[in-house]
Amino acid sequence: MVEQLLLPLWNSLATVDDETLPLMSTALLIARDEYPDLDANLYDTLVQSYVEYLRSEVEEISLWPLKMAAVNRYLFQKLGYSGNHDEYYDPRNSYLNQVFERRLGNPISLAVIQIEVARRLGIPLDGVSFPGHFLVRLPVDDGILVMDPFNGGRPLDAEELRERVRPHLGGEVPDDRALAQILNPAPHRTILVRILRNLHSVYANTNRWDRAARCADRILKLVPNQPEALRDRGLAYLQLGHRSGARNDLTRYLQLYPSTHNVDMVRGHLVDLSNERIQTH
């Protein structure tokens, strides 16, 4: 009997340890919100077929970087997975089932596939929540090898990494210690939240507030009382006319994050909501 891939339950995720939170399964759970008929077993079987194709070649290689090079050749050259440079903000780039089907994705979704295949082959690949552009990292004898899944798994040296991160640090070039901290492995929860934040951004920027609210709500399932997600869900509820939900979320946001830079904006919305409430009584 073929073992079935069981997706986790949203209400259970907050209490799951980061070490045991399944990355690909939870990414597929995110996709199931948009594609309710998604067959998770189909994609689990697909990944396993990649692993079986690569297994004998990878087992004959002794060095991690060369093992990973074989994985990258297969995924990005033979199978044709690639970054969607032309339609970067297409939400399908974040939904893992669509990335498998179209072999197009954004940096983080391609990284999830890369990590899943590598880990099943015993390769200790991790994600890196790099500013602006998600990356992956592999331990090597003299440090780490950092790769760009959006561009075929291309290795990146320290100089290029510093140049990439500099605009996100106000033009400052990080020293070795600061760069090492930026390149720390990302826990699965962090990766999944970033997928959802990407989707929220796409939907909010295109005024699809029901989906924006859903993405913020899912972040709160992963990280209860996460301040930015409370704010984002509250603002989405406001656009949807869910006044009580908006008031509750925005009030809680200010309780958790009283020094936020957008405190005046949030307080303004709460004043408007209070005035509306008074006028209706």
Curated annotation (Swiss-Prot):
Entry keyword Repeat: yes
Domain of life: Bacteria
TPR repeat spans: 193-226, 227-260
Keywords: Repeat, TPR repeat
Keyword Repeat: yes
Name of one Pfam family that matches: TPR_9
Coiled coil: none
PROSITE patterns: TPR, TPR_REGION
InterPro entries: SirB1_N (IPR032698), TPR-like_helical_dom_sf (IPR011990), TPR_rpt (IPR019734)
Family according to the record: Belongs to the UPF0162 family.
PANTHER family, per database record: F-BOX ONLY PROTEIN 21, SI:DKEY-261L7.2
Protein's name in the database: UPF0162 protein XF_1494
Organism ancestry: Bacteria, Pseudomonadati, Pseudomonadota, Gammaproteobacteria, Lysobacterales
